[in-house]
Amino acid sequence: MQKLVRVLPVLMLTLSPIACAHSADSPATAVSPSATAHPAKVAETKAVLRDLWLGHILSIRNVAVATMDKNASARSAAEAGVVANAEQIARSIEPFYGKAASDKLFTLLAGHYGAIRDHLDATVAGAASRQEAAVKALTANAAEISTFLSGANPNLPKDTLMGLLMAHAAHHLTQFQQLKDGDYVHEAETWTGMKQHIYVVSDALAQALAAQFPSKF
């Protein structure tokens, strides 16, 4: 976990939506969002995806708070929110890639949350070995998501996606520890960075869709 958290400041400084959207050596340079996609539609899509991904981190934070409070009913309700949000995120790609791809993304997001939940429970229990196992599962899942999305869209380089997803995971893990420690000042700072970073992720996805499917924008 410590290694994962240490890479976060570097990733936050180096990653951006533009870097994630495409590189000069990528097939993605064949089409750019500004070439034929309607800017207003791209902006609208960015706003929708930002809202969905913000819901992802907010619903998981709700699970974490309920877990720290040992409130089983609140945790159950929060987890239902996580699932509903994952379904919405998965459905957002269906108009572009079809139902099978949407179902696959939902499965991958479920795997992401499963590893996140395992780490949360291990953090509450103070079980270092379980935390490390959860980090391994998170890393494997991030690789699966990166492979899936980069395979679907050439404007999303796999290595860049992996970096974005691991930075995202590090935010979750840092937040859990801060909540456990009652370090609410630093947790608020983590939340600000977490929100900014998830917007980097969602904006990159929107830009990549506009680049690949300009006629839909």
Segments (PLM) and residue ranges:
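Bacterial N-terminal signal peptides
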Residues: 8-17
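Immediate post-signal-peptide N-terminus of mature secreted/exported proteins
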Residues: 30-80
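Intrinsically disordered, low-complexity polar regions and short flexible loop motifs
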Residues: 123, 144, 156, 190, ...
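A cross-kingdom marker for long, charged
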Residues: 186, 190-217
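Long, amphipathic, charge-rich alpha-helical segments that form helical bundles/coiled-coils
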Residues: 55, 104-124, 155-183
